[in-house]
Amino acid sequence: MNISKSLGLLFDKKNIAFSKDISFGKKVCLLDVGARDGIGWPWCTAQNNTLNVILVEPDPIEAKALEDQNQGRVLPYALWNEETELTLNINNSPGTSSVFKPNMPFLQQFEDSQRFEAREEIIIQTKTIDTLAQNKEIDSIDFVKIDVQGGELAILQGGEDFFKKNLVGLEVEVEFCPMYRDQPLFSDVDYFARVNLGLELWDIRKTYWKYSQHEYRMPLKGRLIFGDALYLRPVATLDFWLSSMDKKKSSQKFHALVVTTIAYGFLDYTSALINSDFSENYINKEDKEVLIKHISKISKSFYPFSNGNKYLYRIFQVLMHSFKPTYHGWANAEQHIGSKKTFNFWV
């Protein structure tokens, strides 16, 4: 195999969750709220015939750009916990735009704080997820991703009834520090996701910032500022949750959770699902055998030591951090949520 082909395999963006072999004619339904940059990993690796996508983006310019990209159905709405009128602050860096005012005394401790300064304000009318569902503008959603710079909890509150009945998973941006005035923090979002929606936390992709400094090159990690948290429907309560649905819907939800756990690399979760005592209530024996073979195949990786080697790990970890990308030296983030298979390695 030549070098270029090897590199092509190494950086192949295909995701093993979206194989036609395990789609069984079903599609996972994704709701992406705050979709400015388009569909993110791992969902961006799915084929059109395995995924239905609804993108929600209140910024009219960005919503038009998403429509032109034809990634899915675009709803140019602002979502909240009630139908009301809000002011959207369009900041110097559009990705920091929010209905919350920036907390400048906090942000000015770090570099490049001016990107949070508002250059324009627009008035937006908000809707709630529960209202959209009642009006049939959205149907059965399996997975939701929310990234709206502080407004995540309000959106979850506005869709509590719908989300409790439909979600198998949630990826949501959470803040550990008050980047915006009066915004909810991780503890608030986490409590709501667990207690109100019945989900459980599985992973967090964390982002760190370093205080402004000009004389010395500091260590890589700074203060934990924000992250992307992944929540999944618990195995322990899954059968009870699914049993309240009709046969078609419960089978779809079971399949969506299987695909989601594979997509994020939680194969132990996938295995627990398909080998559970209740799995055959929601998947036939033939499809179950296909899934078992698929998991057996994709779980294989390069494991030279059955329990690892702490000395070699430490050496490679030091080398890895020496080359880790940063944002101008003062901000860095973990690569992704969950585990991702690259070439013959799970990372």
PLM features: residue spans?
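Phosphate/nucleotide-binding beta-alpha loop and adjacent structural elements of enzyme active sites
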Residues: 1-347
